[in-house]
């Protein structure tokens, strides 16, 4: 009997398809997000060098007081933090890699918060 693939497998397949086309450069690095069951992570990556330039997550000391670390409010804080750190390093334009997740909820909140703080994508 054919089993229906689970959500994680489907997301990973989407991510592989997207990564064939989306790559970060030195001038326009890739803003990649990851959601675990308990936290949200974002990092800006230069794929040509294979280096993470800036990172932010809900594991940081400043976000310890949040009630939930996976909801929209937490995603907005992570988006604002990543944008501020990117601007400090001189990064203004990025390519948004949603990592196979739907552009909805915490993913959209993170992206909108980063845009409000000055990142262009």
Curated annotation (Swiss-Prot):
Biased composition annotated in UniProt, kind: Basic residues: 1-22
Keyword terms of this UniProt record: Ribonucleoprotein, Ribosomal protein, RNA-binding, rRNA-binding
InterPro entries: Ribosomal_uL18_bac-type, Ribosomal_uL18_bac/euk
Pfam families: Ribosomal_L18p (PF00861)
Single GO biological process annotation from the record: translation
Any one of the GO CC terms: cytosolic large ribosomal subunit
Single annotated GO MF: 5S rRNA binding
Its job: This is one of the proteins that bind and probably mediate the attachment of the 5S RNA into the large ribosomal subunit, where it forms part of the central protuberance.
Protein family (similarity comment): Belongs to the universal ribosomal protein uL18 family.
PANTHER family attached to this UniProt entry: 39S RIBOSOMAL PROTEIN L18, MITOCHONDRIAL, LARGE RIBOSOMAL SUBUNIT PROTEIN UL18M
Complex formation: Part of the 50S ribosomal subunit; part of the 5S rRNA/L5/L18/L25 subcomplex. Contacts the 5S and 23S rRNAs.
Protein name per the record: Large ribosomal subunit protein uL18
Organism: Syntrophomonas wolfei subsp. wolfei (strain DSM 2245B / Goettingen)
Gene: rplR
């Amino acid at each position: 009997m054919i089993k229906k693939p689970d959500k994680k497998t489907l997301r990973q397949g989407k991510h592989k398809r997207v990564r064939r086309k989306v790559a970060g450069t030195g001038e326009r690095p890739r803003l990649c997000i990851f959601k675990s069951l308990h936290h949200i992570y974002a990092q800006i990556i230069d794929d040509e060098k294979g280096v993470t330039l800036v990172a932010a997550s809900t594991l940081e000391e400043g976000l310890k007081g949040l009630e939930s670390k996976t909801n929209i409010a937490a995603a907005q804080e992570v988006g604002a933090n990543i944008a501020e750190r990117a601007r400090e390093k001189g990064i203004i334009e990025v390519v948004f890699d949603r990592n196979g997740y739907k552009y909805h909820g915490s993913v959209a909140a993170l992206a909108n918060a980063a845009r409000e703080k000055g990142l262009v994508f």
